[in-house]
């Protein structure tokens, strides 16, 4: 049962994180939207509170240890503890390896990989006080296949999958499960903050090239998070990665 549990969702103001925060709250959870974009965080908090859902926005930079510690402290002050953490916040860099400054590489790794490590550490301390918990890392199919000029993103997501099984083993003694989800093509246009929100601009071929027959949407990931966060339903699942990509990574590609 998820009713009354406390969840932290990083990057919960927009995109996949917003869908996860919403479904968690709709299932009776108390949700902290840990978001660096204040406009997005406030909008999402107001939108969900208008529906009677129990959510709180806390401005958070997952790449900053003090910011994370402050977010966890506020979560405990408001809701009494932490039961579930979703490490979703991430940034992207698309640039030639010959043109990308080292600082840009380091920023992506810091947010996408070090951030989840920091959040896991401080949230796990609170989970232990409550007898256990669940950490869900949002990785990517880019951990296993790539497009050109995405080295830091792919490396960070590959590292996050490895961090998942490592934490699962280390934290098992505290009854904390750790899993990861690797989304494929997820269309997030309608889940952005108002100033960026728009209708998806997708072609028929975008859907047709997926064995599932369509491009994914944030709720595809959020529904799996709801299942994985529930110890009654997913209590025997830890240390593994779920690929949610409409079958794209198992499809043979031929040029005709």
Curated annotation (Swiss-Prot):
Active-site residue list: 153 (proton acceptor)
Organism for this UniProt entry: Thermotoga maritima (strain ATCC 43589 / DSM 3109 / JCM 10099 / NBRC 100826 / MSB8)
PANTHER family noted in UniProt: DEHYDROGENASES, SHORT CHAIN (PTHR24321), ESTRADIOL 17-BETA-DEHYDROGENASE 8-RELATED (PTHR24321:SF8)
Keywords for this protein: NADP, Oxidoreductase
Binding site for NADP(+): 9-33
Similarity comment text for this entry: Belongs to the short-chain dehydrogenases/reductases (SDR) family.
Protein name, UniProt field: Uncharacterized oxidoreductase TM_0019
Gene Ontology terms for molecular function: oxidoreductase activity
InterPro entries (alphabetical): NAD(P)-bd_dom_sf, Sc_DH/Rdtase_CS, SDR_fam
A Pfam short name: adh_short_C2
Binding site for substrate: 140
Gene3D superfamilies for this protein: NAD(P)-binding Rossmann-like Domain
EC nos: 1.-.-.-
């Amino acid at each position: 049962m998820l009713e009354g549990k406390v969840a932290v969702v990083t990057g919960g103001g927009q995109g996949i994180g917003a869908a996860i925060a919403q479904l968690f709250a709709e299932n009776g959870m108390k949700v902290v939207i840990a978001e660096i974009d204040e406009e997005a965080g406030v909008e999402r908090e107001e939108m969900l509170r208008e529906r009677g859902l129990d959510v709180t926005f806390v401005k958070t930079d997952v790449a900053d240890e003090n910011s994370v510690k402050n977010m966890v402290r506020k979560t405990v002050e408001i809701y009494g503890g932490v039961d579930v953490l979703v490490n979703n916040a991430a940034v992207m860099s698309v640039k030639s390896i010959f043109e990308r400054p080292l600082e840009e590489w380091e920023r992506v790794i810091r947010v996408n990989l070090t951030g989840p490590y920091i959040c896991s550490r401080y949230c796990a301390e609170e989970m232990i006080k409550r007898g256990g918990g669940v950490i869900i890392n949002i990785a990517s199919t880019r951990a296993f296949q790539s497009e050109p000029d995405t080295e830091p993103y792919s490396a960070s997501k590959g590292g996050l999958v490895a961090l998942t099984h490592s934490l699962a083993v280390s934290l098992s003694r505290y009854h904390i499960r750790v899993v990861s989800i690797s989304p494929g093509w997820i269309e997030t246009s309608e889940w952005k903050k108002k100033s960026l929100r728009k209708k998806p601009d997708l072609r028929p071929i975008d859907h047709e090239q997926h064995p599932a027959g369509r491009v994914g949407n944030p709720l595809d990931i959020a529904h799996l998070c709801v299942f994985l966060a529930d110890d009654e339903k997913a209590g025997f699942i830890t240390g593994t990665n779920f690929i949610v990509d409409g079958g794209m990574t198992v499809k043979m590609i031929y040029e005709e």
